[in-house]
């Protein structure tokens, strides 16, 4: 088992799943990319089997009042399926309210061109990185 393990963040969407991971020390978020549901299993399985992942953080859709949204039930089912597939892997949630909006603002501020911002998956990956960055900040 590796001395340092990573935290993986997931921004689950109906079309794509944005994925990010922490550095081995758990200080920074790094983008992995976007996958579909089957691709997520293929991505996570080798990392989990190698003992490289200590925790998965899933964006949880709450509105600005902290109440559940229409997507919350979908995320609950997704988390349950992750727990069945990876029973020993701890899974936590983090409020993802405005994560996509914040990710878009970050892409604009970083000088990412409009064409690059519209690239499929770019926003989902950025949102996963923001979720993970927020989670890591909360742990300090």
From Swiss-Prot:
Instruction: Give the E.C. number(s).
Output: 3.1.-.-
InterPro entries (UniProt xref)? RNaseH-like_sf (IPR012337), YqgF (IPR005227), YqgF/RNaseH-like_dom (IPR006641), YqgF/RNaseH-like_dom_sf (IPR037027)
Q: Where in the cell is it found?
A: Cytoplasm
Keywords assigned by UniProt, alphabetized: Cytoplasm, Hydrolase, Nuclease, Ribosome biogenesis
Domain of life (superkingdom)? Bacteria
Tell me the GO BP annotations in alphabetical order. rRNA 5'-end processing
Q: Which cysteines are joined by disulfide bonds?
A: none
SMART domains found in the cross-reference section: YqgFc
- Any Pfam family: RuvX
UniProt enzyme class: hydrolase
Q: One GO cellular component from the entry?
A: cytosol
**Chief localisation class:** cytoplasm
Q: Tell me yes or no: is Cytoplasm among this UniProt entry's keywords.
A: yes
What GO terms are given for molecular function?
Answer: nuclease activity
Function (record text): Could be a nuclease involved in processing of the 5'-end of pre-16S rRNA.
Q: Which family does it belong to?
A: Belongs to the YqgF nuclease family.
What is the name of this protein? Putative pre-16S rRNA nuclease
Q: To which species is this protein native? A: Chlorobium chlorochromatii (strain CaD3)
């Amino acid at each position: 088992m590796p001395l340092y393990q990573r935290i993986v963040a997931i921004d689950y969407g109906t079309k794509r799943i944005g994925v990010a991971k922490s550095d081995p020390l758990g200080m920074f978020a790094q983008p992995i990319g976007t996958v579909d549901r089957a691709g997520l299993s293929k991505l996570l399985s080798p990392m989990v089997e190698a003992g490289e992942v200590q925790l998965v953080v899933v964006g949880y859709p709450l509105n600005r009042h902290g109440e559940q949204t229409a997507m919350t039930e979908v995320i609950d089912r997704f988390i349950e399926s992750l727990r069945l597939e990876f029973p020993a892997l701890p899974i936590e949630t983090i409020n993802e309210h405005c994560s996509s909006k914040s990710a878009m603002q970050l892409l604009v501020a970083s000088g990412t061109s409009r064409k690059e911002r519209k690239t499929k998956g770019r926003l989902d990956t950025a949102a996963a990185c923001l979720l993970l960055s927020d989670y890591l900040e909360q742990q300090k």
